[in-house]
Amino acid sequence: MLKKITFSVFTLLLFSHCAQEKSDIRVVCETIPGGNYVIKWETFPPMKGTVMIYESSLPDSFNLHSPLAEAEISKGFKDISFQTGKRNYFKLVFNKKYSVVTAERVIPMQGLFNFRDLGGYYNAKGKQTRWGKLYRSSSLSRATLPDAKELNDLGIQTAIDFRTDKDRLSAPSKYIPSQTFPYPLRGNAPFVYADRILSKKMKAGDVKVYAQDMFSFLLENNSDYFMKMFDLLLDENNYPIVIHCNMGTDRSAVAAALILAALDIDMGRIVNDYMLSNQLIDYNAFIAKDSPFMQDSEIQETFTALLRVHKRAITYSFDKIVKEYGSMDNYFNTALKLTAKKREKLKEIMLY
């Protein structure tokens, strides 16, 4: 189900601003056939010297006395033949001075999809979201036994389930961490528009408007649940945390965008994370071949467009917030009671 993601896309997603100098370091970590890794980097302006690479199964703990590999910075990449059977994190130290932590953003699962780590995003001050702290996913009701093992290995302590009460009852989570919090965000799911699509009253061109309205509705009508979410995020004992909904494309997407915005991640990177879902999900897999949605090309196009995420949905919704509140800072402080002091605490937990 997972589509191959190009280096250029991940370069955007893993853009790293080095706070110590006026250079930028861009790093990407990918798996290659055989389960090994290739780590690629670029430095701006070009940097000479040596990069040392360290490995750990823990995102915040590296043995810097024993490098896994080293390479000339000018080479730009290093193949890593290394397998532990667990998730691996890598710390790159450039010229014994500048360091960047990286890992694979997307974690392949058997039943779950759209599962990814929200680490590795940089804000304007050069602070990086911590790897291994916060994940977003499709519904945990899709978890298989191998998925459950993977989630255990990730050390997941808390799940925040944004699905409706009806969805949770009809499809209970198959992975239950130490604590689960049901926060059923208000708002329509795409599937409620099935009849309008089948009758061709909703066309593909209408979907972007629907997506804008849905995203805005979620933001405007769930402040109580978002406040509860941030309260959980402000307690370091709750981590690692996974947030999930049905497909991980709407409710979880809104929540992830808010969290990244609260950490001062710029809108470009927030949009890139949001749009990544389109590369991780085979939307046609959700439409049975004998489904009425497959009997007509126009209907199929509209329904597929409805399932996809659209850039304008998130930019429109955040622009609307800024227009109403004057700034995202005012929105967090007024609508979500997330004061500057609380945001600083959140940054202490979520950034390094």
Model-derived segments and their meaning:
Residues 5-14:
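Sec-dependent N-terminal signal peptides
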Residues 19-241, 255-352:
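Cys-dependent protein tyrosine phosphatase-like superfamily
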Residues 245:
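Short cysteine clusters
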Residues 248:
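Substrate/cofactor-recognition hotspot
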